[in-house]
C-alpha cells in the first residue's frame, strides 16, 4: 500500500522485499550506518566468521568485472536485465564499501581505486534489498572464470542484516 511505502524504503525499484524502516532523524540514520559497519567488521573478522572468511575475501578481491555471471543469473535475466539485479551490482557495492570504509587508507584512495561510494542509510537499505534479489542458486559461481561466488556474498550480506541488524523479510524472520 502507499502508506506502507512511505514508511519503508522502496528506492531500489519501487518494490520492497525487506522491511527496512525509513529513519526519521539524522541520529537514526547515523545509527543504522554505524550498526551496518560494525556488522560488516564482524563479517570480515576471523574470530566471528572463520568458516566463510576465506571464500568471502576471495570473492571480494578477485572479481574482474567480466559480467560472465550475469548471463547465468535467472533473476537478472527474468528481470529484463535490469542493472540492479545483475549479480555483480550488489557485490560491487559491498566491495566498494569494504575498500573505502574498512581498509586502511580507503577514504584517501577511494577515488583512484574505484571505491568511491557514499555510505548512508539509503545505500545500506538498498544493499539489504539487493541481497534478496538473488536465489542463492550459485550459477554465477559455476560460470565465473575467477571463481567469484556472488551467491555467497549475497548470503553473507543477508546474514549481516538478519543477525546483526534484525532486518530480514517478514516471511522469513517472524513468520518462519
Regions found by a protein language model. Give the residues of each.
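Iron-sulfur (Fe-S) cluster-binding modules
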Residues: 1-65, 70-71, 75, 99-101, ...
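N-terminal cofactor/phosphate-binding cores enriched in small/glycine residues
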Residues: 79-93
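Conserved active-site and cofactor/substrate-binding residues in soluble primary-metabolism enzymes
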Residues: 64, 89, 152
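Cys/His-rich metal-chelating microdomains
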Residues: 66-72, 76-79, 137-143, 147
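Iron-sulfur-cluster electron-transfer modules
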Residues: 32-36, 50-60, 85, 95-176
Amino acid at each position: 500500500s502507499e502508506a506502507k511505502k512511505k514508511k519503508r524504503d522502496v528506492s531500489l525499484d519501487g518494490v520492497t522485499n525487506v522491511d527496512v524502516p525509513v529513519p526519521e532523524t539524522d541520529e537514526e540514520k547515523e545509527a543504522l550506518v554505524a550498526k551496518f559497519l560494525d556488522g560488516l567488521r564482524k563479517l570480515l573478522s576471523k574470530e566471528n566468521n572463520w568458516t566463510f572468511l576465506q571464500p568471502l575475501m576471495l570473492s571480494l578481491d578477485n572479481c574482474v568485472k567480466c559480467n560472465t555471471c550475469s548471463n547465468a543469473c535467472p533473476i537478472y535475466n527474468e528481470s529484463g536485465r535490469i542493472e540492479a539485479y545483475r549479480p555483480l551490482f550488489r557485490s560491487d557495492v559491498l566491495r566498494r564499501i569494504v575498500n573505502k570504509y574498512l581498509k586502511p587508507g580507503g577514504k584517501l584512495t577511494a577515488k583512484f581505486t574505484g571505491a568511491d561510494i557514499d555510505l548512508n542509510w539509503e545505500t545500506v537499505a538498498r544493499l539489504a534489498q539487493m541481497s534478496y534479489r538473488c536465489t542463492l542458486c550459485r550459477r554465477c559461481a559455476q560460470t565465473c572464470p575467477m571463481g567469484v561466488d556472488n551467491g555467497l556474498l549475497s548470503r553473507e550480506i543477508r546474514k549481516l542484516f538478519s543477525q546483526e541488524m534484525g532486518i530480514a523479510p517478514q516471511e522469513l524472520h517472524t513468520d518462519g
